[in-house]
Amino acid sequence: MLGRNIKKYRLLSGMSLRNMADKLGVSHQTIKKYEEGSMMPNSERLIQISKLFNVNISDLLNAFIVPELKFENFRKQSKMSKSKEKGLYMLISDEIAKYLEILNYANEDYSFDKTKWEFKVNSSDDVEKISTEVRKMLGVSDDCALDNLTDKLEDNNFLILEIDYEEKFDGFCEYVDNLAFIILS
């Protein structure tokens, strides 16, 4: 998990392997080995890495079971670089993993009936019809405030997470372990 976290923070920082290696005074192959898990940084190097990314060592050592996400329903702003996008994917995966860990201790059922929310879109006219239908299902009007809409979605077992990330993205939704997640920037 350490290697995955090093890679996540490197990508979130927009650094290449070589860029990170130069900052740490090691070869890019060493960084690659850290990320692959075939080599472990010593404690001095671990401190150096945590300072480079301005994170706690515990953030580097976190070991959540990360779900496999497809990122099919991800909307980003076009100016986001590929490396920042990959870093964001890892960040979202980690946040969902943390949320799943918390839900393990909750004594509530958040399971989601996705068949109720599946709609077929063939044209732009369908989008308008579907949005009207969804508003009816949620019991909200056309001019519903965003906070109220979020509450209504959560009342219908949508799990909404807000992620603070330097680059804005429009949103993301994913179905994981019978749970429906909506991720907002």
Predicted regions located by residue number:
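Short juxta-domain linker segments that transition from a proline/glycine-rich
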Residues: 1-22, 26-185
